[in-house]
Amino acid sequence: MRILKTDIEGVLIIEPQLFEDERGYFFEAFSERKFAELTGIKTRFVQDNESRSAVGVVRGLHFQLPPFAQSKLVRVVRGAILDVAVDIRRGSPTFGRYVAVELSEHNHRQLFIPRGFAHGFSVLEGDAIVEYKCDNYYAPEAEGAIRWDDPALAIDWHTIHNEAIVSAKDKLNPLFEECERLFDYNTDYYA
């Protein structure tokens, strides 16, 4: 397992070690011990989620507020996505900035998104199957969301805006500047 830093502290790309031969391949998708040793992050994932989405689908931007905030570890089993994490920690030097990483069945990369970030993705290839681990349970009362096409964030989703397939619920998400309840950069959400 190899850990790559991104432009935003805490958002990490994980590249597993792949073993290939004439039979196919094998890799360890996650090891809690190795992850903690390589990153210094001690988190315990308690829920696994899976979604299937067609090319052109955009999901997000979603987050859960404290005390139900979630870290996520996202990977693609089939297809390809552009995975996006937006820093929504007030006071952060990267507040309002985002990281976008292509995750695919070919590159086997994973994206670790810490608490304090909004998450979304667009489907670039195939009928994408996305799996993600969460370190806190889903809590509908703590749901938060931001419009995927917020001009202030200016996220390049690698999709044509008027052809994006977005849920009715996500179309109603507020703009970033309208979100009153976000995170505080100086608060430890893992304590």
Where are these regions (language model features)?
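Conserved metal-binding segment of the jelly-roll/cupin
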Residues: 103-127
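Non-catalytic, conserved peripheral segments adjacent to functional cores
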Residues: 1-106, 127, 134-191
